[in-house]
Amino acid sequence: MRPAKSVEGYIIIVTGVHPEATEEQVEDLFADFGPVKNLHLNLDRRTGYVKGYALIEYATLEQAQKAVDEKNLSLLDEKLEVDFAFLEPPERAPRPSISTRSRSQSPEVQHRDRDVAMAEP
């Protein structure tokens, strides 16, 4: 499957982010692959700590691919896993038709009891 483009670029998901990591630390690390257009760290409302993942957007597929291809990333002694956040679904081959009879040729079903009941006053 191919990475899907968002409105403005390509979004990667980074998992394994340390709960005390800051946006600045994450952005500094991932700026090595190209300018970061957007960065989102989801925080736990109760604790205020990072929930363990980040979404990072790059302008080009090449920049995002460099980040995904890097296998030795870590931050605050936590190993990071990186992948594309959105993928395009695979193209489907057209399905062969099961029936050769068109719907307009289907036999007409009559409901005599219902027709009689509806005709009565």
From Swiss-Prot:
Location in the cell: Cytoplasm; Nucleus
**PANTHER family documented for this protein:** RNA-BINDING PROTEIN 8A
Organismal lineage: Eukaryota, Fungi, Dikarya, Ascomycota, Taphrinomycotina
Domain of life from the UniProt record: Eukaryota
Q: Per the record, where are the segments of Polar residues compositional bias?
A: 97-108
Gene Ontology biological-process entries? mRNA cis splicing, via spliceosome; RNA splicing
Q: Which SUPFAM superfamilies match?
A: RNA-binding domain, RBD
Q: Gene3D superfamilies from the xrefs? A: 3.30.70.330
Q: Where is the RRM domain?
A: 10-87
KW Transcription regulation (keyword) present = no
According to its record, what are the GO cellular component terms?
cytosol; exon-exon junction complex; nucleus
Keyword vocabulary terms for this entry:
Cytoplasm, Nucleus, RNA-binding
Q: Where is this region: Disordered?
A: 90-121
Q: What is this protein called?
A: Uncharacterized RNA-binding protein C23A1.09
> Does the record's keyword annotation contain RNA-binding?
yes
Q: Which organism is it from?
A: Schizosaccharomyces pombe (strain 972 / ATCC 24843)
Bias-annotated ranges (Basic and acidic residues): 109-121
Q: Main localisation, per the record?
A: cytoplasm
GO terms for MF = mRNA binding
